[in-house]
């Protein structure tokens, strides 16, 4: 479910996101996460919080919070014009990468990205804590900010309205707890039956 009151963009893969929305010349999933994880496997959602929005963010899935990784950086603005410029706002801004291990989606990565006028990102969930969907994970101090959610593309199907709007480069206004998509049904490794994951 949606993890913040914000403006949302949904992409079925990273290549689509960089073609339509993220124009930073050095953007990569490896740089965003501060690791060498390949980008091919991920579908992603981008949540842009404006200064007037509620700045707490919540668990999008049920799971266990892994060790957060803090990456120091800049505080560039996260408005759409900046995201579509040559600056890699997501890979250069201060951010925290929060892995959440889930039953339905494998490990998902939530990246909280600080922005202009945001002094810090505050984590309220702890490593090893089991969270339920919509439990608070943390908050941004006042200002604009962004969250990026990375999910194994083979395990998730975003809602059609989000994909249609994003394909037209239109952000969708969403609220905490609203549906974003669902787990795909994957073939059972033992037989022909399918089961939700």
Task: Identify the role of each PLM range.
Residues 1-197:
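Contiguous, well-folded functional domains in the mature portion of proteins
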């Amino acid at each position: 479910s949606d993890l913040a009151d914000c403006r949302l963009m949904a992409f079925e893969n990273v290549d689509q996101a960089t073609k339509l929305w993220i124009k930073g010349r050095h953007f990569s999933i490896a740089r965003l996460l501060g690791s060498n994880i390949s980008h091919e496997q991920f579908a992603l959602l981008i949540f842009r919080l404006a200064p007037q929005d509620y700045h707490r963010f919540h668990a999008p899935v049920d799971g266990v919070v892994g060790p957060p990784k803090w990456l120091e950086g800049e505080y560039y603005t996260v408005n759409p014009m900046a995201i579509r410029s040559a600056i890699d706002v997501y890979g250069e801004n201060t951010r925290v990468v929060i892995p959440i291990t889930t039953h339905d989606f494998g490990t998902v990565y939530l990246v909280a990205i600080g922005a202009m006028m945001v002094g810090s990102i505050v984590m309220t969930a702890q490593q090893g804590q089991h969270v339920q969907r919509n439990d608070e994970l943390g908050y941004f101090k006042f200002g604009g900010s962004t969250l990026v959610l990375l999910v194994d593309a083979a395990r998730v199907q975003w809602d059609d309205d989000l994909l249609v709007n994003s394909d037209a480069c239109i952000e969708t206004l969403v609220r905490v707890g609203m549906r974003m998509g669902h787990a795909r049904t994957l073939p059972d490794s033992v037989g022909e039956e399918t089961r939700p994951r």
